[in-house]
Amino acid sequence: MLSPTALLLSASLTTLASAHFVLDWPVKRGFDDDKSGTFPCGGFDTPSSNRTAFPLSGAPIQLDMHHTETNVMVVLGVGNDPGTAFNIILRPTFRERGPENFCMGDIEIPASANLTEGMNATIQVVSNGDPDGGLYQCADITITNTPLTTDEVSQHCTNSSGVTTQAISNPGNANETSESSSSASGTASSSSASATASTGAAPLNSWSGVWALGAAALGGAAALL
């Protein structure tokens, strides 16, 4: 018979194994694997008081991936408590391959968001890792004009061996059925793109609206640093 300590360790390992992805940076609002399929923010509806200073000029998003292939997108909601209004796309849906550490580099805040230093917002990462729909995790941020140092970028941006990204033709939302992917893949460096309205996307779970395209990567693939 297992001791209480062994049972606790076993339960912890089971929880970790069943998680589909974990948002490591910026600091996540909260995580509960049983609620991670709840929109918005994996069931954590209340903004955190522990906000991450996020440079207007761009910063990485660090994920811990628990699948070998996942569709991912990144959206932004503006304000102290955006509720379900995540109406700015920071990264359109792309395919990530490889487990463990995955970094999206240079996630920029588009000028169309009209954010300035000291204003609050929330980043939401969406994936298709759940058989019944999407998975959602959020990070509450405060905008800053101060860029990250090289050491800070290195601390918050790591890719495991073999991790790649791939563009998706006609991408919808990451929580939808996968579309066929294009042949472009690899470790593309990021570039800025002008924000444009996108009305063709299907609703993100129960929410729908006009999305503005923020920073995009070369060839449609996510940036790896």
Language-model regions, residue ranges each:
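Cleavable N-terminal signal peptides of Sec/SRP-targeted secreted and luminal proteins
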Residues: 3-19, 213-220
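Mature extracellular/extracytoplasmic regions of secreted and cell-surface glycoproteins
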Residues: 13-193
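Selective for proline/serine-rich intrinsically disordered segments
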Residues: 1-2, 24, 169, 201
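Cleavable C-terminal sorting propeptides in eukaryotic secreted/cell-surface proteins
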Residues: 194-225
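Positively charged n-region of N-terminal signal peptides that target proteins for export
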Residues: 1-4, 225
